[in-house]
Swiss-Prot record:
Membrane topology according to the record: Peripheral membrane protein
Transport as UniProt keyword: yes
Protein known as: Methionine import ATP-binding protein MetN
PANTHER family: AMINO ACID IMPORT ATP-BINDING PROTEIN, METHIONINE IMPORT ATP-BINDING PROTEIN METN
Family: Belongs to the ABC transporter superfamily. Methionine importer (TC 3.A.1.24) family.
Organism: Mesorhizobium japonicum (strain LMG 29417 / CECT 9101 / MAFF 303099) (Mesorhizobium loti (strain MAFF 303099))
Record keywords, A-Z: Amino-acid transport, ATP-binding, Cell inner membrane, Cell membrane, Membrane, Nucleotide-binding, Translocase, Transport
GO molecular function annotations of the record: ABC-type D-methionine transporter activity; ATP binding; ATP hydrolysis activity
UniProt domain ABC transporter: residue ranges: 26-261
Amino acid sequence: MNQHITASQAIADPTHARPDASQDVVRLVDLKRRFGTTPAIDGISLTVRKGEILGIIGRSGAGKSTLIRCLNGLERPDSGEVFIEGREIGRLGERDLQPLRRRIGMIFQHFNLLSAKTVEDNVALPLKIEGRPKAERLARAAELLDLVGLSEKARAYPASLSGGQKQRVGIARALAARPALLLSDEATSALDPETTRSILALLKDINRQLGLTILLITHEMEVIRSIADRVAVIDAGRIVEQGPVWSVFADPQSDITKSLLGAIRPQLPAELAARLLPASGAETILRVDVAGDAASGPLLSDLATSVPGAFRLVHGGIDHIQQQPVGTLFLSIPGSDASHLAAVITFLKARQARVEVLGHVAHPV
């Protein structure tokens, strides 16, 4: 299956150029939406710049689905404004809203393909609804199926496809009308890990080749980590944290972000975590989160030469997110000398590390 996209395969409008990143495709201003007495969206303000991938993450019931319905005009907010390419959709009637919706493509968790239609007919469906000539529809479908690596499946029916292939058809269909914005609503949640990686790689390639703006809704931090440029964390209808992905991963501020990151951030080995005590013991265990220069420099060797006394690295490592080094180290500080422990923590914080005392162990690690 060909997943590589060459310049000759770029299927945007012939006049397409890499968009100006200073312009916003989406701008939300103090958006609010209630269902009864329950706020689904509670004052969200957000921008999505041209050509970027923004990930919106939160637990079930956080307001993600309501937000995406407000973006495509299927849900009217109680107050606030939704701008798509500079147009406030709340001021548009249904007739004016339809052409704007065609500027928005969408892919879904469960694909939403028409089982009685062939793959190429599913891809061409948005163009058929627009009344485009059959020859144009079929030519566009062929381009898109080549893009997503499914040219040989054009005459097949959805029932014969794997889950990953169905989602590729969904992506091709979402691109049929050359949208300015692609909304992805939990598009990989029903897929196995290997297929998820291939779909995310395809979306990233499409973003790079076409400059397509993507807003993806997910509850999986690994999805955000894989392809997003920025992330916004939603809880109870509010944005509790947002920023570049590497920055949020390196230094999460909110409890909900820390919880969502828990599954993919390095953790203290279970056998050592089980030995932690709140009271002083033979050794103190520190968690040290680093990013940027602190992660790429000789932090531990500098600590050894600058602060007299012993320490041990018991677990951890350095990774790269958005080409930025990000890591977590677990250090053991022997003894009960409070001044030595304070000196270690002071040194690490001076190097822009985030330090947390996890507890103590009664016997050496």
